[in-house]
């Protein structure tokens, strides 16, 4: 790809966000009823190709169950309020009333409480007993400490999620997690990320991960670009990681690693764009935070917001638009892409003539001029 000269001593690639691209219609259209948007990773099949982000404003044990019943995968945050407090509801109510400008300090105080291993097992069991697929997330820093409790509780899919996760973390203070060894010794599929480059993704795929999360610095509640100066626009990031998947398949003799767009997926139109760039599914946060039954009651924040030294996120008030079911599968009563996310994906595929997600990854895209952006 051609590089642009930033100055005499620096060059850089032009990268694109989802807002920078648009999907091109083809010569064929299709009845939406003939379109399948189902997604399967390892032994688990989902009627909707998405994971609900492991954020306390989005996923509680009850919402994880509801999301599973609707065809998706809710991922529990095992470092959040449900594993620190017996009853986090009063704290969730308090957070919903916080002023955004003063919220960071209070969030840091709330999340200073220790994680209780007994609560990890109890929350996972609560979801598992409902009969839906159970997924839970830890950061790389806490994976070794709590992974046994997670597996013993019967998790189906293990998610290791951080702002950015590498296969070659260097630390003089502590022994870093050996991802390859950890995944090899685990009996459940592991999804790991985020990453945003071809090389980083290729290294993560070589660890044996079933899926790779793509993205860091994006998302409605993240301020990573402002704080650290780090971000890769999502359309380019997903396309680069999809290229790594293609090359890894050749290298490994056909092993397929799922690419999951995690960040920058704020509206229904972002989902087909993510798939068009090569994603198999998406991880959704802010759209689900707008649900009437979301734990945050329209307020949204992530673990980056509570970092004790360098917070890289904030509390945002997104408002409420409808139930979780309406947001995922409709019916919609808003014209802005905040509801019926997967009805929109189905219609986008039908409009361009595709019947399967894997086929839709080949759809033509164009770079949109600024005047055509949302």
Q: Model regions: which residues?
A:
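Alpha/beta catalytic cores of nucleotide-metabolism and tRNA/nucleoside-modifying enzymes
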Residues: 1-27, 111-115, 122-125, 187, ...
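Active-site entrance/lid segments in N-terminal catalytic domains of soluble metabolic enzymes
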Residues: 1-252, 258, 288
